[in-house]
């Protein structure tokens, strides 16, 4: 084929090239920590610890196909920083659509769930907070009306399979597979559209810091089921009795309202980690994210407003995940699901190997119950008197995977959780945090307010403010972590700590291609104080063929 004919084909396919070049310089008043909203929910482009930083960010997307039924693009993005360790290939992907089916391969700064991350605290899972990780994705990423329903039944959903980065930390598990999926349904066809969705994220496989290979049972992890592949590995008993891999989930429900062109989105989300919180309308789980986002049709200076309340402080209470206590031999034992045989002979053999007849009779006389296979959990709880078990959910953390749901030192979920590295910087040697897991402050109650607008032409702004009460972690405050029975007397979060986060971003278009921007952010409260300023410019190139 001649060069002329190739060019004709490209022209007929309406291929186009989009290039965006930006540069910025920032400085912070705090030599250890930058204000939260100066770097969060921005795909990990900016450093959370560099006091002064110059960043150059370039990205390009090239449309290979652009048809009604199919499109295909390739993209590449790079970040250069005066902090050389923060320089990286940020994006490299192939993505497209075949009829209603979307697909992607590689690292792309995109999440189908991150809708209002610039005005809210951000998505609890699959957020825009950290740098993109390599993955393959397939699904219907936006609402699609089921044929012959006249838009009354709409669905969206998708599955991703990828890898976490092998970062230089001796505590990290290497070669970790990350699987994420979501499924939503909505009643459309009217100006009020109720919806319900489920999001599930799971880590599986890898090599532990001790060099031990973690078996992969894909379908058990996919479905959140236990796996016999872990039965003979003493350090991974929980995978054989609870669920294979590390799991996080989210129920997402709400209303989309379109009123005279103004769009209102009400949402209520409930996070969970295992069966203890999987019921979308159950009363056991008290943690949630609820909010409202309003986009105004004809308003310029106030084009959108959001209000959100996040609570993750309960985590089903202080009780250990499973029953734990001292048996008649003085041994501290944790009882996992499946440890106690349910057949008559096996059950009593297990009971008498750990408890005396006097223990059993004392409990039966006090409660009026008769011990058997179906009430042994009540016996264990009340005999050991350590409170209800099934708590300490430790959101976005996992015992097998120290790094939890993080990439590049940032949460791939909500940015309001603090890592151990961050906490050490603001503790200033006060109190104690033993560092059992990556996120040492994941019990947070927060209110976030966001505003955006402009003159409708050249000037635009975004303002976001968050007030938070930080309670640390239920696992970090006990000696021994998740199954610890004794609290640290000098735990840093013995009392909750209040913190404020605020940011304002202003953009001004000098031309269709060139704009300048400024960001002013500040944090203050009982954790740390910091003020940061960033100024920058952005240049866009769009070529249509």
Descriptions of predicted regions:
Residues 23-31, 62, 76-82, 98-100, ...:
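Transmembrane beta-strands of outer-membrane beta-barrel pores
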């Amino acid at each position: 084929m001649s060069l002329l004919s190739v060019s004709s084909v490209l022209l007929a396919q309406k291929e186009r090239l989009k290039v965006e070049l930006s540069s910025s310089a920032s400085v912070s008043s705090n030599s250890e920590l930058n204000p939260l909203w100066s770097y969060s929910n921005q795909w990990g482009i900016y450093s959370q610890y560099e006091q002064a930083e110059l960043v150059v960010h370039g990205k390009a997307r090239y449309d290979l196909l652009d048809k009604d039924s199919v499109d295909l693009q390739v993209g590449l993005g790079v970040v250069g920083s005066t902090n050389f360790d923060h320089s990286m290939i940020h994006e490299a992907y192939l993505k497209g659509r075949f009829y209603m089916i979307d697909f992607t391969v590689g690292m792309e700064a995109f999440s189908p769930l991150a809708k209002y991350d610039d005005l809210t605290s951000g998505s609890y899972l699959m957020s825009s907070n950290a740098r993109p990780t390599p993955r393959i994705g397939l699904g219907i990423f936006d609402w699609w009306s089921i044929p012959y329903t006249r838009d009354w039944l709409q669905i969206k959903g998708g599955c991703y399979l990828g890898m976490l980065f092998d970062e230089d930390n001796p505590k990290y598990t290497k070669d970790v597979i990350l699987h994420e999926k979501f499924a939503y349904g909505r009643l459309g066809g009217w100006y009020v559209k109720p919806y319900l969705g489920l999001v599930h994220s799971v880590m599986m496989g890898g090599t532990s810091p001790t060099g031990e290979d973690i078996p992969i049972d894909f379908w058990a992890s996919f479905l959140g089921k236990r796996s016999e592949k872990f039965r003979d590995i003493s350090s991974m008993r929980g995978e054989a009795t609870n669920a294979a891999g590390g799991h996080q989930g989210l129920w997402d429900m709400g209303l989309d309202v379109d009123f005279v062109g103004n769009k209102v989105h009400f949402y209520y989300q409930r996070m969970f980690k295992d069966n203890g919180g999987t019921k979308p309308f159950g009363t056991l789980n008290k943690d949630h994210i609820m909010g409202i986002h309003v986009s105004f049709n004809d308003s310029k200076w106030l084009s959108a407003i959001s209000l959100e309340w996040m609570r993750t402080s309960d985590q089903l209470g202080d009780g250990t995940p499973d029953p734990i206590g001292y048996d008649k031999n003085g041994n501290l034992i944790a009882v996992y699901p499946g440890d106690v045989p349910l057949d008559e002979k096996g059950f009593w053999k297990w009971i008498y190997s750990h408890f005396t007849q006097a223990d059993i009779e004392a409990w039966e006389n006090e409660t009026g119950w008769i011990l058997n296979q179906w009430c042994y959990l009540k016996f264990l709880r009340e005999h050991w008197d350590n409170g209800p078990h099934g708590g300490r959910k430790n959101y976005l953390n996992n015992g097998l995977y120290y790094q939890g749901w993080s990439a590049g030192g940032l949460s791939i979920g909500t940015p309001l959780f603090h890592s151990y590295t961050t906490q050490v910087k603001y503790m200033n040697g006060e109190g104690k945090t033993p560092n059992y897991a990556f996120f040492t402050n994941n019990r947070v109650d927060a209110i976030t307010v966001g505003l955006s607008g402009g003159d409708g032409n050249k000037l635009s702004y975004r303002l976001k403010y968050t007030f938070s009460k930080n309670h640390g972690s239920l696992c970090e405050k006990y000696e021994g972590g998740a199954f610890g029975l004794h609290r640290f007397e000098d735990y840093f979060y013995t009392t909750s700590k209040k913190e404020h986060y605020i940011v304002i971003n202003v953009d001004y278009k000098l031309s269709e291609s060139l704009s300048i921007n400024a960001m002013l952010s500040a944090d203050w409260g009982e954790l740390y104080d910091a003020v940061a300023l960033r100024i920058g410019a952005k240049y866009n190139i769009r070529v249509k063929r």
